[in-house]
A protein has these predicted regions:
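Basic/polar phosphate-binding segments, predominantly the helix-turn-helix DNA-binding elements
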Residues: 4-18, 33-35, 40-77, 91, ...
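Intrinsic structural disorder/low-complexity segments
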Residues: 16, 29, 127-129
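DNA major-groove recognition helices of helix-turn-helix
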Residues: 30, 65, 82
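Short, basic, alpha-helical segments at the C-terminal edge of helix-turn-helix-like DNA-binding modules
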Residues: 74-84, 122-131
């Protein structure tokens, strides 16, 4: 299990979002679940149950308290997890997609571009060029 003080040292999430996640026990429980199961299917229902709420109520609560949706949190943390693989390892993008919980390379690439503004292969090339 992750130390809760370490859960949200994220380079992609804004500092105020990280503070809000840590401040509310329900959002922290859900966010910890995401971090601990990043390579697996993440279900809103499971996060809501950990927070002691229904899915609908939790979804509203999370967005209201944190300032982003739960699905945005999941996508952002998955992409952040992928960054270290792209920066440190060679390997197929399809394998990386599976390791970060995406069912297809296409879905992963779309999410990556949405968060990072470039494709995973473009990001990797840029990192190699900067070395």
């Amino acid at each position: 299990m992750l130390d809760t003080t370490q859960v949200f040292r994220s380079r992609l999430l804004a500092d105020d979002v990280q503070r809000r996640i840590l401040y509310y026990p329900r959002t922290l429980a859900a966010a910890t679940y995401v971090r601990e199961h990043i390579g697996e299917p993440i279900r809103l229902e499971t996060a809501a149950a950990l927070a002691g709420m229904t899915s609908c109520a939790f979804s509203r609560y999370f967005a209201e308290k944190v300032g982003i949706t739960f699905s945005t949190l999941v996508k952002t943390l998955r992409i952040e997890h992928a960054l270290s693989f792209l920066e440190e390892r060679d390997g197929a993008i399809s394998a990386l997609a599976a390791q970060t919980g995406y069912q297809s390379c296409c879905t992963f690439s779309r999410a990556f571009k949405d968060v990072m503004g470039q494709s995973p292969s473009e990001y990797r090339r840029r990192m190699l060029f900067q070395r």
